[in-house]
Amino acid sequence: MAENEGAGNQPVALDIDTLEASIEKSRMQRRRSARISGILYPLAVVLGVLAAWEAGTRLLGVPTFLLPPPSAVAGSLRANASLLLFHGWVTTIEIVLGFVLSIAIGIPLALAIFLWPIFSRSILPLLISSQAMPKVAVAPLLLVWFGFGLLPKVLIAFLIAFFPIVISTAVGLSTIEPEKIYLARSMGFGSVTTFCKIRLPNALPEIFGGLKISITLAVVGAVVGEFVGGDAGLGYLLMVANGSMDTQLLFAGIIALTILGVALFLVVELAERLAIPRHIIAGDNATHLS
């Protein structure tokens, strides 16, 4: 009898294993399909816009200095590749240094805001007020104080980029389920151990959300600095192209700046995936299942 019952349970176990394998395979297929569609759909939109742009400028006879066709912009990209690479490298250095400075100051500042409520009540109004101040108005002062070198551009990138890091880090450290803290205390964790093993990992998604916003704002800050007082960089190149009415080079510089910004954003996103892969996977699964 026992042997018959054991034999009767085997098909049920096999059916459950088969069902789980089928569900996992279906999830993988949905993820793959979502990745492909996430690439193909935007690409189709871009190609459609470029085709309409090319056809419209040629059929309507729009002057090149007003709106060059994409083919002319592509030609300018090829012809000025070395120039764009040189100025792009200068802008990249300014962005990265401003971004690193934002992290080096923003995260400790957020930690102080989280740890000391009095400090938080004192400093937060000043931080919010600083964001209401237009950075373009501050840029000439930085040029007067620090000259026309690299430092003013880095500082402008920092001033624009550090605020999201401060806010997202402070929110991430403050937002945690009380049950996790109770569990850590019941296991005998001290304050430092609880912070390092529970609170900080829990805050990583919020922190990286702020970092991704910050890196895009650092691009804006570097370009603003180059507009005001640069002698190199993509922002400076855009000013030169605008002054000489070289619209093709102007569009080429905008494209190069866009590619640079997207590339830096993807670097931060890759760091996020390496630091918190479970969070990313869980987010993807929730998106696809919904």
What are these regions (language model features)?
Residues 22-32, 58-103:
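Periplasmic/extracellular loop-to-transmembrane helix junction in inner-membrane transport proteins
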Residues 33-59:
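N-terminal signal-anchor transmembrane alpha helix
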Residues 77, 84-88, 92, 122-130, ...:
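Hydrophobic alpha-helical elements at and bordering transmembrane segments
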Residues 98-127:
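Transmembrane-helix boundary motif in ABC transporter permease subunits
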Residues 117, 205, 251-290:
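C-terminal transmembrane helix and the adjacent membrane-cytosol boundary/short C-terminal tail
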Residues 127-164, 171-175:
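Generic hydrophobic transmembrane alpha-helix motif, especially the helices
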Residues 155-159, 191-225, 252, 256-257:
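Transmembrane alpha-helices
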Residues 165-168, 172-213, 234, 238:
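Short cytoplasmic-facing helical segments at TM-TM junctions of multi-pass membrane proteins
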